[in-house]
Amino acid sequence: MKRQKRKQSITLIEMMVVITLIGIIGGALAFNMRGSIHKGKVFQSEQNCAKVYDILMMEYATGGSSLKEIIAHKETVVEEASWCKEGRKLLKDAWGEDLIVQLNDKGDDLVIFSKRVQSSNKK
């Protein structure tokens, strides 16, 4: 007589436990990704500020324009920079808001910042 081999299959409860564990792990990863995405946006905004500062100060060093004139025409200065491809995008932070470009208290240097980055650094 031949004995039939019995296949062992996964029960419904075992399958539900596995799916629940996958959901819990996925939720934890998604929660941690939110912080990483925010840090990435802060980094991108800081890099944009640094690039805009470099472009505007190079214009100040090479041209006969004052810092006030450069601030007034910052869009055209950044767009016409030969080593910058998409100048308009540099003048925005990672959230799509305009960067703030102004003179420092002494009036001899530029201060470039993003309101969102400053508010997140205060927290």
Curated annotation (Swiss-Prot):
UniProt subcellular location: Cell outer membrane
Signal peptide: 1-30
Coiled-coil parts of chain: none
One GO term describing the cellular component: cell outer membrane
Disulphide linkage map: none
Membrane topology listed for this record: Peripheral membrane protein
Pfam families in the cross-refs: N_methyl
Entry keyword set: Cell outer membrane, Membrane, Signal
NCBIfam families (alphabetical): IV_pilin_GFxxxE (TIGR02532)
Name this protein carries in UniProt: Putative outer membrane protein CPn_0818/CP_1053/CPj0818/CpB0847
Organism: Chlamydia pneumoniae
